[in-house]
Amino acid sequence: MLKREMNIADYDAELWQAMEQEKVRQEEHIELIASENYTSPRVMQAQGSQLTNKYAEGYPGKRYYGGCEYVDVVEQLAIDRAKELFGADYANVQPHSGSQANFAVYTALLQPGDTVLGMNLAQGGHLTHGSPVNFSGKLYNIIPYGIDESGKIDYDDMAKQAQEHKPKMIIGGFSAYSGIVDWAKMREIADSIGAYLFVDMAHVAGLIAAGVYPNPVPHAHVVTTTTHKTLAGPRGGLILAKGGSEELYKKLNSAVFPSAQGGPLMHVIAAKAVALKEAMEPEFKVYQQQVAKNAKAMVEVFLNRGYKVVSGGTENHLFLLDLVDKNLTGKEADAALGRANITVNKNSVPNDPKSPFVTSGIRIGSPAVTRRGFKEAEVKELAGWMCDVLDNINDDAVIERVKGKVLDICARFPVYA
């Protein structure tokens, strides 16, 4: 007989120590990586459930294994909630990650060698939008589009590239772009050449669910997202669509299973269902509104302290600091802030003279700090501390002083009570 109340600490002290150290790190560090967030205890409870034991290849009502009557209920709840939350009429909740979801879309809509128009990674795109080191860049002919001198997406250049190269698919979405994307304009460009519009909304899904950022679902042929990041659920992927054909939806389902994956992770799908329900609550909208307010408040401080923000501001949860004028690399800034218990990530900026392993910028996001209760006053104070560190990157006394302030505010705003 298996006893569920057993403690890992009693069995595997070495592993438990690492887990406990990570728990302490999360409580004692300020998390500003834009793609990270804190999920709820309810989500973690679902993800740690006995559903992990069940194989369920196939889809609700059409499984290859017996004993799926209850996991069918779980998956259907997740599907229905995803469709309701984002205004879709199709949802696949099985992708293990956002990259897996994107791979399924490529598989369903394209053939290897087809031409794809995607956002340049160096100007805000994502690995799966055509990076040469990713499957997308290896299997498909990628034509990049980017941003103009003001830091906004260059739709004129996008349209020109579309007419010249006639891609079969245009990708919208980003991993480091702080503006509003005109999904309708992108669909217009796609329609002008008979291309698919595929949107990866992973970074802004939570903002979209709360009505804080424009929803691409009514405009795109297919939309993908992660279920963590701003959505604050478990790590996983999701595919959505509206107004498509049954043939398209069958292709998408087949591209997930059996093409790319086998058995779905039913414990994670249950956790997705919980997170999607949480995203329908009124307090989730308040949270997402605060995420956007906090990002803007931080930008204001950095600009006032003489730092360059790419595109001059933010309309979502993230922004990039361009450190070229400060003669700092992103790697140096990342390390110095880390010594003060502030976690960011180095990030390339437009026309970056440094390699992707060094970079000339850092990416900053507000979802996690907002989740632990920070509002404008706290994030403005935090941004000021960050400027103190970046202004005195080799001054250990300044960094230690900021670290002390970070530890104090983290104690006042715990992640988990």
UniProtKB/Swiss-Prot annotation:
Q: What is this protein called?
A: Serine hydroxymethyltransferase
**Is Cytoplasm found in the keyword set?**
yes
Q: Which reaction does it catalyse?
A: (6R)-5,10-methylene-5,6,7,8-tetrahydrofolate + glycine + H2O = (6S)-5,6,7,8-tetrahydrofolate + L-serine
Can you state the subunit structure given in the record? Homodimer.
Q: Gene3D superfamilies given for it?
A: Aspartate Aminotransferase, domain 1, Type I PLP-dependent aspartate aminotransferase-like (Major domain)
Q: Does the keyword Secreted apply?
A: no
The site feature described as Plays an important role in substrate specificity is recorded at H228
Q: Which organism is it from?
A: Klebsiella pneumoniae subsp. pneumoniae (strain ATCC 700721 / MGH 78578)
Which superkingdom is the protein from?
Bacteria
SUPFAM superfamilies attached to this UniProt entry: PLP-dependent transferases
Predominant place of localization: cytoplasm
Cofactor dependency: pyridoxal 5'-phosphate
An example GO biological process term is: glycine biosynthetic process from serine
Give the protein's function.
Answer: Catalyzes the reversible interconversion of serine and glycine with tetrahydrofolate (THF) serving as the one-carbon carrier. This reaction serves as the major source of one-carbon groups required for the biosynthesis of purines, thymidylate, methionine, and other important biomolecules. Also exhibits THF-independent aldolase activity toward beta-hydroxyamino acids, producing glycine and aldehydes, via a retro-aldol mechanism.
